[in-house]
């Protein structure tokens, strides 16, 4: 006699989890690399603020890559320094405001934003995707638009989808301001 339906489903889920885990890095391996990148980037004169983002900031057990966010008015200068970081073994992509490198056997992604959009970008790039969707839906219900650039009051705007920065910006310098604009307390990354 074969497996029952529930047992078969559990086996399928465990196999899928194992396959996904193979393509991902353990937090214990990825976090030290993220902290090294953070120390390096945070020490640059052109950097106003730097934070780990993504699943590492949310303290997930595994991560697909290392995400670091920087606030700076000098994006290209920061990108050049990041590509030249001593841990970098390969540059996968480098533009004016984002770059991806291989370091420590992992992909490390850097995003550089202007300082007054840092809070919005930190919230957005920390995720999770489901959390961000829920926040955007809450914003829409309040005639607001929420994205990685801030929260915008789009009441009275003919086409709120006409661009990323449409309407009057009401939040975005800090993460707390993003949640406050939606009448929510700041949600810790681990709960997102």
Language-model features: locations:
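Active-site nucleotide-donor binding segment shared across nucleotidyl transfer reactions
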Residues: 35-77
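Non-catalytic nucleic-acid-binding/docking modules located in mid-to-C-terminal regions
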Residues: 6-11, 15, 46, 60-61, ...
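Flexible glycine-/small-residue-rich
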Residues: 13-15, 70-72, 112-114
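Catalytic cores of large soluble enzymes that bind and process phosphate-bearing ligands
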Residues: 3, 7, 22-33, 70-71, ...
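Helical scaffold of the NTase/Pol beta-like nucleotidyltransferase catalytic core
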Residues: 1-51
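Acidic, metal-coordinating catalytic segment for phosphate/diphosphate chemistry
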Residues: 76, 80-192
């Amino acid at each position: 006699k074969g497996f029952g339906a529930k047992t078969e489903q559990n086996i399928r889920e465990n196999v899928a989890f194992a396959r996904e885990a193979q393509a991902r890095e353990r937090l214990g391996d990825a976090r030290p690399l993220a902290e090294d990148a953070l120390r390096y980037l945070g020490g640059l004169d052109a950097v106003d603020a730097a934070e780990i983002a993504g699943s590492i900031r949310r303290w997930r057990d595994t991560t697909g890559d290392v995400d670091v966010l920087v606030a700076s008015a000098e994006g290209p200068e920061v990108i050049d320094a990041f590509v030249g970081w001593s841990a970098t073994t390969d540059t996968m992509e480098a533009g004016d405001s984002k770059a991806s490198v291989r370091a420590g056997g992992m992909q490390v992604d850097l995003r550089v934003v202007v300082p007054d959009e840092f809070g919005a970008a930190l919230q957005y790039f920390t995720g999770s995707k489901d959390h961000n969707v829920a926040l955007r839906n809450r914003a829409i219900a309040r005639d607001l638009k929420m994205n990685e650039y801030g929260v915008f009051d789009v009441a009275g705007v003919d086409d709120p989808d006409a661009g990323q920065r449409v309407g009057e910006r009401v939040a975005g310098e800090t993460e707390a301001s993003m949640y406050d604009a939606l009448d929510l307390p700041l949600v810790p990354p681990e709960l997102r």
